[in-house]
Amino acid sequence: MDGIKLVNVSKFYTVEKESIKVLNGIDLNIPANKITVILGRSGCGKTTLLRLVSGLEEFDQGEILGTNSKRKAYVFQEDRLMPWLDVKKNITFGIHNKNIDNRKIDRIIETVGLKKFYSAYPRQLSGGMKQRVSIARAFAYDPDFIMMDEPFSALDFFTREQMQNELLKIHQTSKCSILFVTHSIDEALILGDKIVILEKGVIKSQYEIKEKSSTRDLLDDKFVKLKKQIIDDLKVI
């Protein structure tokens, strides 16, 4: 499967009759079968970029190549579950193929730690469990490409770490492409095969990480230096 390519993509919003450029001339290659992380501060255009690639919004200039033939799924910051459906029915909701592979669904449910909550309803789940359902639903759709908009930002540190590990585990078996938005540098370093720094609607820098996620040590000199460089890129004081 080929990746996705953005060529000179710009997006404008009109606020009180004034045109504001939210994204400005974005050139970006999103590689296939990898996790590409978009990192930046609030208001830099991360979510807008995600929505353009997903097709939820239209861009005003440029081209986005390679999306038409791809099956896409989206994981939002909030869970967006159906309160009247149990865990399994929420996960299979929207899968129109009547020949659902129940063994595959069961494997996904087990991978994200929901085996004991198979028949539970959203009101019975914690925030972390609800996001597990959202992620399982995205992968159950068997997509080529998943967009994730800060899906772990509302979780506590320990749950967030668990979710990162579970995402990496399930990605290993699916090998789909993921475009992941975050404002956490550590999260970007843990998850990203490619890290894209976005600032005020433009790409400031890009980094590729060759090490497997399972072997990364953020206290290693290489990652300490990379984190410092990213902090400098973001002008974080």
Please describe what each predicted stretch is.
Residues 135:
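Hydrophobic anchor residue at the start of the ABC signature
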Residues 100-117, 169:
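Conserved ABC ATPase "signature" region
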Residues 121-125, 129:
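Conserved ABC ATPase signature
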Residues 140-144:
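A short, proline-enriched helix->beta-strand linker immediately N-terminal to the Walker B motif
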Residues 54:
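Helix-to-loop junction immediately C-terminal to a conserved catalytic motif
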Residues 146-149:
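Catalytic Walker B motif of ABC-type/P-loop ATPase nucleotide-binding domains
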